[in-house]
């Protein structure tokens, strides 16, 4: 496991990025200067409009979201979002082969 030094920015993958915990964690990490990759399938377990509103707050426009493609935040240069399903093994392997978290 890598040691994290004080004042070192992290690169973090957050699953459930549009949910309550994921959204607030994203905001906190972005506020301290970390690089955040948000991942969410945007299912209808609860209000989908609330999930999209949270994504809008971090600069991800609903109409720019494309399945299995990263969307760059218009507010935070250090935030990208991808709509994908954690059960899509091929897509998850692709994400981890392209980036190191």
Language model segments and positions:
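N-terminal Rossmann-like NAD(P)+-binding domain of SDR-like oxidoreductases, especially those catalyzing
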Residues: 1-101
């Amino acid at each position: 496991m890598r040691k994290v030094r004080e004042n070192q920015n992290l690169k973090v993958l957050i699953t459930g990025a549009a949910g309550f915990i994921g959204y607030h964690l994203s905001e906190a990490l972005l506020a301290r200067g970390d690089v955040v990759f948000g991942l969410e399938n945007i299912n209808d377990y609860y209000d989908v409009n609330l999930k999209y509103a949270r994504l809008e707050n971090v600069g991800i426009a609903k109409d720019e979201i494309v399945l299995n493609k990263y969307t760059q935040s218009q507010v935070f240069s250090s935030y990208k979002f991808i709509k994908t399903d954690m059960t899509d093994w091929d897509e998850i392997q692709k994400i981890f082969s392209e980036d190191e978290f």
